[in-house]
Amino acid sequence: MKKIFFTSFILLLLDQTLKIWIKTSFFLGEEYKIFDWFIIHFTENNGMAFGIEFGGYTGKKILTLFRIIVVGVGIMYIFNLTKKRISDGALIALGLIIGGAIGNIIDSSFYGIIFNESYNNIASFMPDGGGYSSFLHGKVVDMFYFPLINSHFPSWLPIWGSEHFIFFRPVFNIADAGISVGIFMIFLFYRKEFN
């Protein structure tokens, strides 16, 4: 259980530190190019992965509560699972998933209360006029953008000929990466330990 807690804590610390720095240092939509294929691009996400939204104001609250319930059930499952002997790698994978999920839940639950809007200005932490939204209605901060291939389709293609093409468009954060890496590790290396 210590490995899961430690991994989750480190991921959560890195995730929230970077998100708070981005939120209080960048305008919404601002970019900082590290390489042509690695860009820090500040965006906010109201809903699920890839900006998919669910049912407006009420849907946002339901989605955030659903995330909290799933993480709670996941933690109980992990607690029961750790009574059996499972490998250190599987524990680290679980820690990445839980830490990432908690990181995005923090944004969804509290960022609307503790930050003001980032549209026309850089957000302030704990602004005098209050935050941009209410409890459970915050936006998840995303910043990593990797346009690994930025080109055009060949002109001879019948449907997309000459259209602009970017491979790996999603903008994501450390929490998203932790969840993805943790799931990938389980499916690739540790699937039999969870059967």
Task: Please identify what each model-predicted range represents.
Residues 1-195:
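Alpha-helical transmembrane bundles and membrane-interface segments of multipass inner-membrane proteins
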